[in-house]
Amino acid sequence: MKSCKATKIEAVLTMDSKGQILLPKELRERAGLKAGDRLVAIAGCDENEEVCCLILVKAELVDEEMRSIIAPMLKGVVG
């Protein structure tokens, strides 16, 4: 699995009335995303269990190693 070397703010997104967000074309191209690609949304929660951040990961990158890292976080969400 590739590891990220750096993070930065790429775009400010707006949600429409249908709950959809649009990733800017330049970002989609840089990420190699195309129509029909699947993304996994990982939610980070604060001490009050309020979602404070979302991370999007290409579904094909969610391998067993990543699942083992995510699993403990999901226990708190799904019980």
UniProtKB/Swiss-Prot annotation:
Question: A Pfam family name for this chain?
Answer: MazE_antitoxin
Question: Per the record's keyword annotation, is DNA-binding included, yes or no?
Answer: yes
Which of UniProt's keywords are assigned here? DNA-binding
Source taxonomy: Archaea, Methanobacteriati, Methanobacteriota, Archaeoglobi, Archaeoglobales
Q: Which NCBIfam families match?
A: lp_hng_hel_AbrB, near_HgcAB
Cross-referenced SUPFAM superfamilies: AbrB/MazE/MraZ-like
Q: Which InterPro entries match?
A: SpoVT-AbrB_dom, SpoVT-AbrB_sf
The Swiss-Prot or TrEMBL record annotates one GO molecular function as: DNA binding
Where the record annotates domain SpoVT-AbrB, the positions are: 10-60
What name appears for this protein in its UniProt entry?
Uncharacterized protein AF_0476
